[in-house]
Amino acid sequence: MTLAAAGLLSCTGTGQSAFDPASVADASGEVTRVEPLSWWTGMQTPLQLLVNGAGIAAYDVRIEGGQGVGVKARHKADSPNYLFVDVEVKPDAEPGTYYLVFSQGERQFKVPYEIAARAEGSVARKSFTTADMIYLLMPDRFANGDASNDSTPHTRERADRSAFFGRHGGDLQGMIDHLDYIAGLGATAVWPTPLLLDDEPEGSYHGYACGDYYRIDPRFGSNELYREFVGKAHEHGLKVIMDIVTNHCGTGHWWMKDLPFRDWIHQFPEYTGTNVCFSTNMDPNASRYDLDLQESGWFVPSMPDMNLDNPYVLQYFKQWAVWWIEYAGLDGFRVDTYPYNEKVPMSEWCAAVRREYPGFNLSLIHI
């Protein structure tokens, strides 16, 4: 058994309803997703794998392939289709391909997992500062460098330049093609709005309703092309700031049809939006009612509010942030809707990023 499409399957989740474990069929252990997609030696962040597959919670798991990498613990979720695996990567672990070996009685299958060596100087990377001139752009509206990906078979909203809130076709290739232009303006850093998959049926051009935290929207390009964009931006003397969202995902996120835990997102008997009173996040005299509604209410109906008080959610979010920095060679984050997050877990999230990259700056502005 191999990992289908290296964990980069198309999103299928569209529902908003509460998770009901009884509604999920128990099948025979096919792993469809392992996240993070890969990892590195010498990291400070503990590695906890999210494994998704029909009935996977019934399986034991061990790691083969070399010395210094092994399973520390496994944790079941509310859904039988998830398993969280704590992995130890010792300081002397060798980079290479390891195998997650899943077993249940006589049945056994393996899933490859890559542990790579960190890039030289990764920890000491320089970040953006107040000395930088930052160029903000919206990828879908900037430049269309590849018309073939304007609409794709596995994303719901198709390109329509006549629609004011529709997708217009801008992409990563268009951004790469115009790096000379951006640098020529005197910019020293570039901040694109979110590029991760947004699979909402309409209004997905802005990217703020994430459908997969480990996948660049195919209408913009690919993970590999994003990494190429960052590298070419650096060649032009431009730092790259990734725009990310920790407060919410989108209703089109792949996990929305089968949440790992009932409290993976904040749920209510009926739709409950945030009170948009983000001053409560910093007000020691704020009422608990106002603060809870600010932190737990959904930003809009298409953006389910993540529950960062759930330790598995928080660890998942720490890891995907670190993964993108290391994978793509990023220079900074802009964190959208920061005041809508739970304050204490987000302080832990910030600390995890800065522990891995002490000089890495986080812009917490909210527009």
PLM regions and their residue ranges:
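Substrate-binding/active-site clefts of carbohydrate-active enzymes
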Residues: 142-322, 327, 346-361
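Beta-strand/beta-sandwich contexts
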Residues: 17-58, 111-125
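Compositionally biased low-complexity segments at domain edges in trafficked proteins
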Residues: 125-149
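Short catalytic-loop micro-motif centered on adjacent basic/acidic residues
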Residues: 241, 332-338
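Immunoglobulin-like IPT/TIG beta-sandwich domains and homologous Ig-like subdomains
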Residues: 43-106
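Conserved small/polar residues in nucleotide/adenosyl-binding loops
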Residues: 365-367
